[in-house]
């Protein structure tokens, strides 16, 4: 059976892995998933990530914990295949009054809401992470 929303699957694997106190989670890789993982690493929500394999690449995310608790409190898919959500640069949301991040897909690549505001770009809101 084919996967309808691979990004939602990625976010669910992160959520489930942290609730089960897993060290790492694996999933099928894609360019968008690697870009999202890069943003999560830069913002300190995951330890590290790596892509392994040639024919069917696998993305492995090393999850991050602080004093035994998961760093990611909530991770929520916003734009989905059935309902895409696009925002202009002035309309970009602030997650938890700036404590969390919104992952935005822009014409210049995948970035946080703060980076998109600085660059003066709008785009598709992929997910919220707090």
Curated annotation (Swiss-Prot):
Instruction: List all membrane-crossing ranges.
Output: none
Q: Which InterPro entries match?
A: Ribosomal_uS8, Ribosomal_uS8_CS, Ribosomal_uS8_sf
Q: For this UniProt entry, which residues form the secretion signal?
A: none
Q: Which GO terms describe its molecular function?
A: rRNA binding; structural constituent of ribosome
GO cellular component entries? ribonucleoprotein complex; ribosome
Please indicate which superkingdom the organism of origin belongs to.
Answer: Bacteria
Q: What are the UniProt keywords, alphabetically? A: Ribonucleoprotein, Ribosomal protein, RNA-binding, rRNA-binding
Alphabetically, which GO biological process terms does the record hold?
translation
- HAMAP family, per the entry: Ribosomal_uS8_B
What is this protein's function?
One of the primary rRNA binding proteins, it binds directly to 16S rRNA central domain where it helps coordinate assembly of the platform of the 30S subunit.
Q: How does it assemble?
A: Part of the 30S ribosomal subunit. Contacts proteins S5 and S12.
Q: Which family, according to UniProt?
A: Belongs to the universal ribosomal protein uS8 family.
Protein name as catalogued: Small ribosomal subunit protein uS8
> Which source organism?
Yersinia enterocolitica serotype O:8 / biotype 1B (strain NCTC 13174 / 8081)
**Gene behind the chain:** rpsH
């Amino acid at each position: 059976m084919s996967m309808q929303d691979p990004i939602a699957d990625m976010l669910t694997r992160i959520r489930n892995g942290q609730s089960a106190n897993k060290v790492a989670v694996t999933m099928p890789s894609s360019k968008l998933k690697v870009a999202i993982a890069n943003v999560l690493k830069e913002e300190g929500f995951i330890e590290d990530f790596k892509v392994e394999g040639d024919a069917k690449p696998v993305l492995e995310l090393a999850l991050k914990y602080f004093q035994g608790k998961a760093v990611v409190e909530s991770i929520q898919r916003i734009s989905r295949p059935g309902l895409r959500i696009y925002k202009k640069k002035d309309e970009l949301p602030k997650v938890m009054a700036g404590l969390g991040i919104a992952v935005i897909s822009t014409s210049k690549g995948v970035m946080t809401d703060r980076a998109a505001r600085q660059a003066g770009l709008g785009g598709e809101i992929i997910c919220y992470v707090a």
